[in-house]
Amino acid sequence: MSRVGKQPVEIPSGVTVTVTPDNVVTVKGTKGQLEKAMHKDMKIAVEDNKVVVTRPSDSKNHKALHGLTRALINNMVIGVTEGFSKTLQLVGVGYKAQLKGKSLILNLGYSHPIEVASIEGVTFEIPDANTVVVKGINKELVGSVAADIRTFRKPEPYKGKGIKYSDEVIRRKEGKTGK
């Protein structure tokens, strides 16, 4: 069995998980509701406050789907109880972030400010001018929005300027040495 897939997903109190016959999993919790269609081959059952995922065969594809399905359901449960967040840091002279309504304005050394429109299910927080926190209940969406923001100015290896994740380490290069 898949080591990830064979572990059942614990359902905390205040969370309800429902599975339709066509494998659409709905998770409702204190922070909101998430819904995702899972692969039709996987059997998903809710048994005494646990979600159990079983696979039809031991083929390589089914083994991979088994662990994936269990991990996706686990992320949905964590999302509706705790939520997810990604922290981005703006490194560079004059680089700053600010909120305008619900959208995010970034000054990244370009001739124009960059505006990131608010996306449903994702909120932005700015603890200080050089830090942006992307929060939401959908792990995939939070990571995707954070990655999109990072692409506006990826960290460069010589001075380390750009937008980086808070836990990311930038590999630095040495510049050219003069004669």
From Swiss-Prot:
Source species: Clostridium acetobutylicum (strain ATCC 824 / DSM 792 / JCM 1419 / IAM 19013 / LMG 5710 / NBRC 13948 / NRRL B-527 / VKM B-1787 / 2291 / W)
Gene that this sequence comes from: rplF
PROSITE patterns per the UniProt record, alphabetical: RIBOSOMAL_L6_1
Domain of life: Bacteria
Physiological role: This protein binds to the 23S rRNA, and is important in its secondary structure. It is located near the subunit interface in the base of the L7/L12 stalk, and near the tRNA binding site of the peptidyltransferase center.
Protein name: Large ribosomal subunit protein uL6
NCBIfam families (UniProt xref): L6_bact (TIGR03654)
Pfam families given in the database record: Ribosomal_L6 (PF00347)
Assembly information from the UniProt record: Part of the 50S ribosomal subunit.
RNA-binding is among the record's keywords: yes
Assigned GO CC terms: cytosolic large ribosomal subunit
UniProtKB keywords: Ribonucleoprotein, Ribosomal protein, RNA-binding, rRNA-binding
Any one Gene Ontology BP term: cytoplasmic translation
GO molecular function, one term: rRNA binding
HAMAP family: Ribosomal_uL6_B (MF_01365_B)
Keyword rRNA-binding: yes
Family statement: Belongs to the universal ribosomal protein uL6 family.
